């Protein structure tokens, strides 16, 4: 999945969990669970286009979190956000820095994901984002 759904999930976990161990564990777990949902993901590459895409994605996720946490942005929320994107950042670093001894992680991370076309893959991610936004306003 893109960064935005992961960032929102991590922020939501940071809002409701008090213990930092649980925040990290649940954020990582939800990252992997979200990756099981069929989605669109650009492939890791050292290119201007990928950097721009990822930067805009991070910015959108950050801005959505700022909007959703209005005044209750805490270190726990930040920790949840960082932990939730760690698997993707780690995979990107392994691929781009050619850290071949860590390729098993990248293989595992790719294996659990089902890539769909940009249209359907983005539609699924928009639904995930909307569910988290609705949860924020209806439940928490």
Task: Tell me the role of every PLM-derived stretch.
Residues 1-140:
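N-terminal membrane-targeting hydrophobic helices
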């Amino acid at each position: 999945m893109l960064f935005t759904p992961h960032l929102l999930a991590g922020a939501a976990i940071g809002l409701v969990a008090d213990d930092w161990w649980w925040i990290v564990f649940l954020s990582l777990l939800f990252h992997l669970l979200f990756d099981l949902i069929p989605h669109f993901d650009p492939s890791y590459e050292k290119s201007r286009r990928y950097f721009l895409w990822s930067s805009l994605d991070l910015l959108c996720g950050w801005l959505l979190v700022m909007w959703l946490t209005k005044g209750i942005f805490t270190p726990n929320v930040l920790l949840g956000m960082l932990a939730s994107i760690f698997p993707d950042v780690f995979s990107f670093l392994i691929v781009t820095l050619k850290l071949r001894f860590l390729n098993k992680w990248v293989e595992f991370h790719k294996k659990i994901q089902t890539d769909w076309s940009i249209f359907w893959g983005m539609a699924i991610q928009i639904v995930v984002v909307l569910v988290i936004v609705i949860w924020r306003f209806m439940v928490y």
